[in-house]
């Protein structure tokens, strides 16, 4: 008899983007990406939704941050 997988109905924790009025002043805009800024050595995406920005988690690669931004944008188009 096989053992059941532990924590079968464990909730998936999803990242809830922080809402900010604007990217912080000490963030450096990455010219080659639409939504990516460099913040404390990490790459963060800021996506303008309505009147505020949604902030991504910190990524080590700028492409990942841009991919996150594109995904958020697509989800935003679906809900509106």
UniProtKB/Swiss-Prot annotation:
<dbReference type="InterPro" id="IPR038463">
    <property type="entry name" value="CedA-like_sf"/>
</dbReference>
<keyword id="KW-0238">DNA-binding</keyword>
<dbReference type="InterPro" id="IPR019666">
    <property type="entry name" value="Cell_div_activator_CedA"/>
</dbReference>
<dbReference type="Pfam" id="PF10729">
    <property type="entry name" value="CedA"/>
</dbReference>
<comment type="subunit">
    <text>In pull-down experiments interacts with aceE, dnaK, glmS, lpp, rplB, rplC, rpoB, ybcJ, zwf.</text>
</comment>
<dbReference type="GO" id="GO:0003690">
    <property type="term" value="F:double-stranded DNA binding"/>
</dbReference>
<keyword id="KW-0132">Cell division</keyword>
<dbReference type="GO" id="GO:0051301">
    <property type="term" value="P:cell division"/>
</dbReference>
<protein>
    <recommendedName>
        <fullName>Cell division activator CedA</fullName>
    </recommendedName>
</protein>
<comment type="similarity">
    <text>Belongs to the CedA family.</text>
</comment>
<comment type="function">
    <text>Activates the cell division inhibited by chromosomal DNA over-replication.</text>
</comment>
<keyword id="KW-0131">Cell cycle</keyword>
<dbReference type="GO" id="GO:0051302">
    <property type="term" value="P:regulation of cell division"/>
</dbReference>
């Amino acid at each position: 008899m096989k053992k059941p997988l532990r924590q079968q109905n464990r909730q998936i924790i999803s990242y809830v983007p922080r809402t900010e009025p604007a990217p912080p002043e000490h963030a450096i805009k990455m010219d080659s990406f639409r939504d990516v800024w460099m913040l404390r050595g990490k790459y963060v995406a800021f996506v303008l939704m309505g009147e505020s920005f949604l902030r991504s988690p910190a990524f080590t690669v700028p492409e990942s941050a841009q991919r996150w931004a594109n995904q958020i944008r697509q989800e935003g188009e679906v809900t509106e």
